[in-house]
Amino acid sequence: MRRPMVAGNWKMHGTRASVAELTQGLGNMLIPEGIEVAVFPPALFINEVIDGLKGKGITVGAQNSAVQPEQGALTGEVAPSQLAEVGCKFVLIGHSERRQVIGESEEVLNRKFAAAQKSGLTPVLCIGETLEEREAGKTLEVVGRQLSSVIDAFGIAAFANAVIAYEPVWAIGTGLTASPQQAQDVHAAIRKQLAAKDAEVAQNVQLLYGGSVKAANAAELFGMPDIDGGLIGGASLNADEFGAICRAAGN
């Protein structure tokens, strides 16, 4: 049975003071039994957050990592092996802001995916379509292509140690949210695509939904059969709101 997961992507938010306050609030949160909770702070604060959440049942991940697994001459980057050494468990790969704003290609994302796994991190592969692509009826084509890029490079077995987050680009930070049924339809298509290669991998992989998830809509989204939790943006910056989302996943 798949374990529900709630992941908080803090993006480029936080000061030392606000991160300390948020970390303390999360540490006081009651985690429902049987769910996995992870947070992804800015790289600058990863050590502080890991220290502050020790023994609290919350794991920590990174928002980005380098294309090579080991440390070396790559200015401005952080190696996944370095992230693993300090205690990170997960790393986001392919978030739409990395794809669109930074311009990361499928080739670069595949290298990051492989480097993360080689270093013992679990990649959270983010996929999703723009509003233009959805309105053109290309949602499943786009999501399928993004998923196939990894499958074609590394085989379906790569998803035995990975998480997939479907984040429609048009719903990230806009207040717009895919309806529970819209999200479920895409998640079901993702699982079907994986099952065509390996039914067991498809059955076991966690599929998260991201895109303006909040306490008010989390329960309905998480009640869908192929939605195993959420990748939360803005709402993860408030410990009370994030806690309510975690409780929704626990139910």
From Swiss-Prot:
Pathway: Carbohydrate biosynthesis; gluconeogenesis; Carbohydrate degradation; glycolysis; D-glyceraldehyde 3-phosphate from glycerone phosphate: step 1/1. This is Triosephosphate isomerase. Substrate binds at residues 9-11, 173, 212, 233-234. One of its GO terms (biological process) is glycolytic process. One of its GO terms (cellular component) is cytosol. Keywords: Cytoplasm, Gluconeogenesis, Glycolysis, Isomerase. Involved in the gluconeogenesis. Catalyzes stereospecifically the conversion of dihydroxyacetone phosphate (DHAP) to D-glyceraldehyde-3-phosphate (G3P). The active site is at residues 95, 167. It comes from Pseudomonas putida (strain W619).
